[in-house]
Amino acid sequence: MTHILFAVLVLALLALAFGIILGFAAVKFHVEADPIVDQLDALLPQTQCGQCGYPGCKPYAEALANGDQINKCVPGGDATMRKIADLMGVEPQPLGGAEAAAPIKKVAFIHEDQCIGCTKCIQACPVDAIVGATKAMHTVIADECTGCDLCVDPCPTDCIEMIPVPTTVDNWKWDLANVAIPVKIVE
């Protein structure tokens, strides 16, 4: 019985000692983070897709804080770009670059008759929009898919295709900038 109590006491003392060392190290080696980077990172969709040219959302937030273009986040879309513009105090820009028109939103589509159930696409999807099991066909949850295109390359049978999102009453947007509204002048 004393051996058990001794072992428990030794482990408790070791835990206390390592806790004190870790606490000291956390205070001694603390790195101040830029609050604007944290705010920008919170606005980004956290898909870690890399379409902006950076390996994830945090590096893109750091680049934004250093003056990079605010319109590179394709999965975040126009709404995210406008929130970033408001936070940074700059004018909104067209998505994808000043010379580019707004990109057509696409989602992944799996040709289920060709799918071998290897799960490589599931592992590549940063938002878990692909469901399926090993050696069973997979499918994409279209409402969750951001169109990041990361699932296409790992597929060994090339059964994944990026297709445009069909226009429905849920996603249709009226281009009010190009609509002429007749005005009757009352005197």
Swiss-Prot record:
All residue ranges annotated as the 4Fe-4S domain in the record: 32-90
Region Hydrophobic, annotated ranges: 1-26
Major subcellular location class: membrane
Gene Ontology biological-process entries: electron transport chain
Residues annotated to bind [4Fe-4S] cluster 3: 125, 145, 148, 151
EC number(s) reported in the record: 7.-.-.-
Cofactor(s) for this UniProt protein: [4Fe-4S] cluster
Subcellular location: Cell inner membrane
Keywords for the protein's UniProt record, in alphabetical order: 4Fe-4S, Cell inner membrane, Cell membrane, Electron transport, Iron, Iron-sulfur, Membrane, Metal-binding, Repeat, Translocase, Transport
PROSITE patterns assigned: 4FE4S (PS51656), 4FE4S_FER_1 (PS00198), 4FE4S_FER_2 (PS51379)
Gene3D superfamilies: 3.30.70.20, Electron transport complex subunit B, putative Fe-S cluster
Occurrences of domain 4Fe-4S ferredoxin-type (ranges): 106-135, 136-165
Residues given in the record as [4Fe-4S] cluster 1 binding sites: 49, 52, 57, 73
GO cellular component, as recorded: plasma membrane
Any GO molecular function: metal ion binding
Cofactor binding: number and manner: Binds 3 [4Fe-4S] clusters.
Subunit structure of this chain's protein: The complex is composed of six subunits: RnfA, RnfB, RnfC, RnfD, RnfE and RnfG.
Main function: Part of a membrane-bound complex that couples electron transfer with translocation of ions across the membrane.
Name of protein: Ion-translocating oxidoreductase complex subunit B
